[in-house]
Curated annotation (Swiss-Prot):
Pfam families: Fun_ATP-synt_8. One of its GO terms (cellular component) is mitochondrial inner membrane. It comes from the Eukaryota. Residues 33-48 are mitochondrial matrix. It is found in: Mitochondrion inner membrane. F-type ATP synthases have 2 components, the catalytic core F(1) and the membrane-embedded component F(0), linked together by a central stalk and a peripheral stalk. The central stalk, also called rotor shaft, is often seen as part of F(1). The peripheral stalk is seen as part of F(0). F(0) contains the membrane channel next to the rotor. F-type ATP synthases form dimers but each monomer functions independently in ATP generation. GO terms for molecular function: proton transmembrane transporter activity. The keyword Mitochondrion applies. GO terms for biological process: proton motive force-driven ATP synthesis. It comes from Yarrowia lipolytica (strain CLIB 122 / E 150). The gene is ATP8. Residues 1-12 are mitochondrial intermembrane. This is ATP synthase protein 8. Belongs to the ATPase protein 8 family.
């Protein structure tokens, strides 16, 4: 199992942080604003 070989630790840490950064960036740019717009619209509809 390459997960337990110390030679691969830095590679896994690097690609883990890189993929996590890409996921956070994509969520913050594309996915979360859409849900925020839906949430704000629902709040405005229920308060009037």
């Amino acid at each position: 199992m390459p997960q337990l070989v110390p030679f691969y630790f830095t590679n896994q840490i690097f690609y883990g942080f890189a993929s996590l950064s890409v996921i956070v960036y994509l969520f913050s740019i594309y996915i979360l604003p859409h849900y925020l717009e839906i949430y704000v619209t629902r709040i405005f509809i229920t308060k009037t």
